[in-house]
Design a protein with these regions (language model features):
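Low-complexity, Pro/Ser/Thr- and charge-rich linker/hinge segments at domain boundaries
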Residues: 232-248
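Acidic-aromatic/histidine active-site loop/patch
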Residues: 244-281
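Short, glycine/small-residue-enriched coil/turn segments at secondary-structure junctions
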Residues: 105-106, 140-153, 272-284
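Exposed beta-strand face motif in extracellular beta-rich ectodomains
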Residues: 208-210, 285, 344-346
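N-terminal secretory signal peptides
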Residues: 1-18, 22-29, 33, 41-43
Length: 368
């Protein structure tokens, strides 16, 4: 059965307004009150009783709940998504860069190779909320592929899914390697049917922060269901040494109404509120940031208590601005560089209240 046609699965549904029951993150409460005055955020961190006292809930008829869904994630008592059940852990994913396998060609150039497999896989995006995803290599987002400018890249794609798929890389490459339906059929490229395979091969250019995704229609469905990943091309001379992080801003339409009910960085709502990202005071931190959010026109990243240098698309070694908030439309990406001069816990989140309420919120734990 095509999971897209299953419009009303009780275990998948979630409304945007009926949010979270309590995150058990008491240390976050003082910062939280400065974020947004909305009751759902206080529910997520402080529990229903305290939230009701501070922000009484307005009367809302059940029929007005978006999507009409009854099931929703429950964070009460510190409930969390089990990374082992999903087969991937956002705490590990944030520093996981896949360099593939390399060998020298006769010309002396480095050949870097990967294998990506598309599959159908149910994942949990919030406690009790299962989602019928399409994945590359068993995870959402797919592996963060990393290489160096000028290398020869070879990506073997195997479609193990029940649907036709491709891989479209952002970068400079021949038309046959574009992963675009209608370009390459008859030569093994274009749309790759279930059970089929194709090898994409091209030069790593230009350097910067890029990404890849399926390009089969309906495009919104293939992206929203999880077929995407980050693709980093390092400059030939590299970048200054840093603690490097990958953050993919995404979301999930859990009741299939073309509107997201869960927002996140690296797939699991509120994961980095439960498990803050640990960094060292005064150490250079580099964040590779990608917005692949479907159904919403824009996303944003804001950090508390600090500013960062921003390099749009990462194709220049000089930052474009020094700020604490940036916006990205779908497919936009960039590199953020910063140092934390103070120890302690600092929040980062989407500077759109609804996204933060529904999972796109976390913390840095600065040590030293």
């Amino acid at each position: 059965m095509d999971p897209d046609k299953n419009k009303n699965p009780a275990n998948h549904r979630l409304t945007r307004r009926r949010l979270m029951g309590g995150l058990a993150a008491g240390a976050a409460i003082p910062v939280l009150h400065e974020l947004v005055p909305h009751r759902p955020v206080h529910q997520a961190f402080e529990g229903d009783a305290h939230a009701a006292a501070v922000h009484p809930a307005p009367a809302v008829e059940a029929s007005t709940q978006k999507g009409g869904a009854a099931a929703h994630p429950d964070f009460a008592g510190g409930r969390r998504v089990n990374p082992r059940a999903n087969g991937f852990d956002p705490s590990e994913m944030v520093r996981d860069f896949d360099y593939g396998k390399t060998r020298r060609m006769a010309s002396g150039r480095v050949l870097r190779e990967w294998t990506l497999i598309a599959e159908d896989k149910e994942i949990e995006v919030a406690p009790g909320v299962k989602y019928p995803a399409w994945v590359y290599n068993g995870r959402v987002p797919g592996p963060t592929l990393r290489c160096r400018e000028g290398e020869r890249l070879r990506v073997r794609f195997i479609n193990g899914s029940s649907h036709p798929h491709t891989i479209h890389f952002h970068g400079i490459h021949p038309a046959l390697m574009d992963g675009m339906p209608g370009t390459g059929e008859g030569k093994g490229g274009g749309v790759i049917q279930p059970g089929g395979s194709f090898t994409y091969e091209f030069e790593a250019a230009p350097f910067g922060m890029h990404h890849y995704h399926c390009h089969v229609l309906p495009l919104a469905s293939h992206i929203a269901k999880g077929l995407y990943g980050a693709f980093i091309v390092d400059p030939k001379k590299g970048r200054p040494e840093a603690d490097e992080l990958i953050m993919v801003m995404n979301g999930f339409d859990t009741n299939f109404d073309s509107s997201n009910e869960v927002y996140a960085v690296n797939t699991i709502g509120f994961h980095y509120a439960h498990e803050p990202i640990r960094v060292k005071r005064n150490q250079l931190v580099r964040i590779y940031l990608l917005n692949i959010l479907e159904f919403d026109q824009i996303n944003s990243f804001h950090i508390h208590g600090n500013f960062f240098d921003y390099f749009p698309t990462g194709t220049s070694l000089k930052p474009s601005e020094y700020t604490d908030t940036i916006m990205q439309a779908q497919g936009q990406r960039g590199i953020l560089e910063l140092r934390f001069p103070h120890a302690g816990r600092f929040m980062f989140h989407a500077h759109k209240s609804e996204f933060a309420e529904l999972g796109w919120l976390g913390f840095f734990e600065v040590e030293g």
